[in-house]
Amino acid sequence: MPGATSHVPLLSVVIPTYNRAALLDRTLGTLARQTTALEDFEVVVSDDGSTDTTRDVVRSYEDRLRIKYVFQEDLGYRVASARNGGARLASAPLLAFLDTGVLAGPQYVQSVLAAHAGPAPAKVVLGCCYGYDPRNPHPELHSLVEEFPPEEAVRRVGDAPWFQDMRLPEFTAVDFDLSRMHMPWLWFWTLNVSLPAADFWRVGGFDEDFTGWGGEDIELGYRLHAHGIPMTVSRESWGIEAPHERTHEANVSSLMLNCDRFVRKHPSLLPELFWAVTNRGIFGSVETERLRFEEWASQARGQQVLDEIAIGLDTLPPSQHTQRVAVFGSGTEGLPITPRQNVELFLCDYDEGVLARQESRDDAAVSTWHLSGLRTPWPDQHFDLVIITSRMDGPRQAWGEAFTKEAHRIASSVVEPSLRGD
């Protein structure tokens, strides 16, 4: 029996699930017909509190797969916790994560192992996933995967545009060389991904503060990238996402909450742009916005706004208590900013270079933040004042009143000196 072997597997495939027994059965069925010897990989099903026949489905594969099962109480949508629980139970040096409903090709395990083999450094492998388009699932997909096994489905429609991995245009643009991407972490989607277990735990695994649908995988990708762990794409370790019911509006709402968590945990421009672009449309181009902010930074370099900041500070009423002031578009180019007594300054600018000198100051009353002001990590009404300078003119042409709206969210007073005629 596959489950009785003492041979250490080469790969652990972790599948989180919740009340989708039929879909899980289909995913496990494709893993049971891999070309790789069954003793060389194991499957770990991590149950997020199912009340259907999920446990019975897992038991039905005990004579066909090396399979483990872990259950956690249903305390709401906790897929990050479920994946971590599955990873803790895994015994292989490599982890793969598949979503319930992903139908793996027969050489999936073999291809994952091949992608991680050789003298190349340990890396994250993004496996392709055909058919995934939560915005607009294609009507032919259901009948296709019902009628044919995965490899035959790919043979029949593998070149059809509607069947492609949604990320294909992004991958093609860099000839599948993710080292040419500024933000490869944006495409770290755990419907099909693999990485060394040591690297997974080195960065802390999934952040279990992320509950609800969406974003927890991209945030992990962000941390992996920040730790210098390279990412690559494998077109060979593919799967097909079987169509299933989705609560799209609820998912989008949940995703935005998690994007907000992302910004609070990693307060810098790129997570901020991820929040802003996702808020406009779930699969917008963050890279396009990054390049636009680079251009605006180039145009504004050398622009001094110290007089505008002084005008804004003059609007503060006298106070015996410390007052917090944030500046959107602080610039400064390293010139000194000396806040008045009892004022704590938070200097925000989308050009990280102009903040460098301020960061070297030994001044507890001044802190620098590589943020534009589209979405900040602070709670509502955290500041007494936000000053928006003319360095924001370029971004405001594209983003309109978004900066003013965010300023009013976090502060009781907002001043834009360049619009006052002072």
From Swiss-Prot:
Organism: Streptomyces hygroscopicus subsp. jinggangensis (strain 5008)
Keywords, alphabetical: Antibiotic biosynthesis, Manganese, Metal-binding, Transferase
Listed cofactors: Mn(2+)
Domain note: Instead of having the common DXD motif at the position 99-101, it contains a DTG sequence, which may provide greater metal ion binding flexibility.
GO MF, one example: metal ion binding
Protein name: Validoxylamine A glucosyltransferase
Record-linked Pfam families: Glyco_transf_7C, Glycos_transf_2
Keyword Manganese: yes
